[in-house]
Amino acid sequence: MTLSPDRVLPSHVLVEACENYQKQSYRNRCYILAGDGPQMLQVPVVHGPSMAMADVRIDYSTPWVVRTQRALDTAYETAAYYEYYRDDLFALLDAQPEKLWELNLSTIRFLLDKTGIACELEPTKDFVLPDTEADDYRYIIHPKRPDDVLTGLGLERPYYQVFRDRMGGFTPRLSALDLLFNEGPDSIGWLFSV
């Protein structure tokens, strides 16, 4: 990772494309805040043992795209900025990319663009062993690991959420989409403040 001239934002990030696909990870799922609490959105995949992440295909035999779009509409239709981002996000899903890697990369680019973060993403050409690079964040956030890192980085600092009153306050550990739909262009300010 290379930092931008302001020494805060990365200007160049390597994105792992050569690792083996890991089940039960955030590679094909995320959480949004629905009216009854966190809801998992999952992209069904077709994969084999020891399959590289870049080779994992998306399974379109079920109507998961429509279900995902309906879940997003239901959860965020009253969010302040959802209507401004909805069509662009849905276009990514409607494009039905063949590979999970393609969908993930286009979603990351969408989030970078909408938050105003200028960053070059470069897919890796070979697998790099963990902890051999100084700024290796590949395995920090995982559903099966403690969230100490998120707390330490300040990523559980509250921002406005549509269902905060119903949930009894802020709900952490959600997709960056939750931040974007609720904070819109101010998302970058929230990210800078953590």
Where are these regions (language model features)?
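Residues lining hydrophobic/aromatic ligand-binding pockets adjacent to catalytic sites
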Residues: 1-194
